[in-house]
């Protein structure tokens, strides 16, 4: 009897999904918490659940130096393009680019950046041309990278590059970040403009990286009040998180009225993450995706942090099923990495009875004070900003419209061609 991985599907949402089979083969180092290999696990699960049949699969053109220069400095891009583990000692200004233990130089660094950035840029292009309702690139979402330096395991800020592309067609772009770390690189890039509203839900306080994202960071000049920060304490659970997430996002939608959304789904906000300190379940995390999706606004869905590899794969696979309106079986299908999911072999593990690593330090009164302050700031906006968009600049990447006429038969052929994700 064939194992039924899909329990229900009523999807009318047009979804495209970006994956390059090489992206999971890059290696930060033996003791580094960032493991691109998590992408291999994610995509193998997506395939074995049959979710690829509910969306169009793409291998994006890797971003080149010209693409990266839309945001990053020439010196920095040149450094990324030419530095290798073999020649790094020849560079006198490595510290200027913040290269070190957190952001090491590893074999294929530039190619890795090109691949994950290319998926985000091309996803933005397809949304711009109204080819899809949702574009997914789990390899993207590296939100800490700055204009001229690496930061927090991030080298090229694919999110900023994608938003710059979206701004060619959209007057207002909303960026939402549910990573446990503050989306500082994206906030900094758009801190002075009202055309991008950044909304970040994150741990704040003490020495927790990156140390930014207090509620009083609201933007400046034209961008004043267009940076929204929700600083949270350790141990927040699904109920408390959603009780602040939903009213804040509803308020943002009511007052800002974006025409496109970028959603960064960092999975380090999950319970038991290697570096995180929240207590979200996969279903709670995915409820944020479901809520954003309910507004029926074109959305670019990206990855981000996440350092307990098996849970990252579980989370992003489940959120892929949410994007394509498909209910999947909680029992994992057999896949190339099945041993990673021992001993339960469940998509959403049952943690009932297990002790919390972090107690919930978010009081009801504190969360309510955040909600009140943020909604007060949103009301000051009064109306959504508008701009006159004149001649639209050319796309960063050329669009091949013929690729979007793929039938289900062609999708199955593509699955066979790209079936090896190891």
From Swiss-Prot:
The active site is at residue 144. One of its GO terms (cellular component) is cytoplasm. Residues 399-422 are annotated as: Disordered. GO terms for biological process: epigenetic regulation of gene expression; sporulation. Its EC number is 3.5.1.98. It is found in: Nucleus; Cytoplasm. InterPro entries: HDAC_PDAC (IPR050284), His_deacetylse (IPR000286), His_deacetylse_1 (IPR003084), His_deacetylse_dom (IPR023801), His_deacetylse_dom_sf (IPR037138), Ureohydrolase_dom_sf (IPR023696). Keywords: Chromatin regulator, Cytoplasm, Hydrolase, Metal-binding, Nucleus, Repressor, Transcription, Transcription regulation. A divalent metal cation binds at residues 179, 181, 268. It catalyses: N(6)-acetyl-L-lysyl-[histone] + H2O = L-lysyl-[histone] + acetate. The keyword Metal-binding applies. It comes from the Eukaryota. GO terms for molecular function: histone deacetylase activity; histone deacetylase activity, hydrolytic mechanism; metal ion binding. Pfam families: Hist_deacetyl. Disruption phenotype: Develop normally but when mixed with wild type cells they sporulate less efficiently than the wild type. Do not show major alterations in gross histone acetylation levels. The keyword Iron does not apply. Residues 413-422 have a biased composition (Basic residues). Gene3D superfamilies: Histone deacetylase domain. Belongs to the histone deacetylase family. HD type 1 subfamily. This is Histone deacetylase B. The gene is hdaB.
